[in-house]
Amino acid sequence: MKLIIQDGKEEDHLQVLNKQLEIGIDEVGRGAVFGPVFSAAVVLTEKNGYTLKQLGVTDSKKLTEKKRKLLLPKIISLSSDYSLGQSSAREIDQLGIRYATELSMIRAIKKLKSKPYEVIIDGPLSLRLWKSHQRNIIAGDSKFTSIAAASIVAKVTRDFLMERLEKKFSGYFIFKNKGYGTKEHLLSLKANGVTNLHRKSFLTKLNLI
């Protein structure tokens, strides 16, 4: 690959190109008691990041479900690349939520077509198994469009999975609670028991099993 000079250093063209891209990472479902934790990675150019910001891309928690679903195809269309990773309820129970969340992020990063020079991660969770450059940004989904876009991709995708699982796990109100420990959900556990997709490590701490 042809070498070019960047800030007095020789770097290959692909590395310089990757530095011009913003790669945001975010997770969803970390605090749920049912189902996997999802992470998304979204790669944006500065121009397309600005366009998405103008379209209303921000922290997924600040958007309605309808707005998130409307923005998803726009994010996919304008991103240079995007990917998803997840860790199952079983992995969460075996590894702990911190490590399982980190694993889901790394799985998302590894699915990207090219190795990123640097990733920007929402929150304080550093990726111990990722040896490349990374930045942790508190409230990053409100500050970086790529992280905000990743939060929307992860949220819409996980919510869709929860809605599909409602048919198989009826009686737990998964369609409504999306796997989170609402009062209705926790009461249903006493009536219906624990499924193989419930996070038993979480339920143990809540004295539910």
Curated annotation (Swiss-Prot):
It is found in: Cytoplasm. InterPro entries: RNase_HII, RNase_HII/HIII, RNase_HII/HIII_dom, RNaseH-like_sf, RNaseH_sf. It catalyses: Endonucleolytic cleavage to 5'-phosphomonoester. CDD domains: RNase_HII_bacteria_HII_like. Manganese or magnesium. Binds 1 divalent metal ion per monomer in the absence of substrate. May bind a second metal ion after substrate binding. One of its GO terms (biological process) is mismatch repair. Its main location: cytoplasm. Its EC number is 3.1.26.4. Keywords: Cytoplasm, Endonuclease, Hydrolase, Manganese, Metal-binding, Nuclease. Its cofactor is Mn(2+); Mg(2+). GO terms for cellular component: cytoplasm; ribonuclease H2 complex. Signal peptide: none annotated. PROSITE patterns: RNASE_H_2. Coiled coil: none annotated. One of its GO terms (molecular function) is RNA-DNA hybrid ribonuclease activity. Belongs to the RNase HII family. Endonuclease that specifically degrades the RNA of RNA-DNA hybrids. HAMAP family: RNase_HII_B. This is Ribonuclease HII. The lineage of its organism: Bacteria, Bacillati, Cyanobacteriota, Cyanophyceae, Synechococcales. The gene is rnhB.
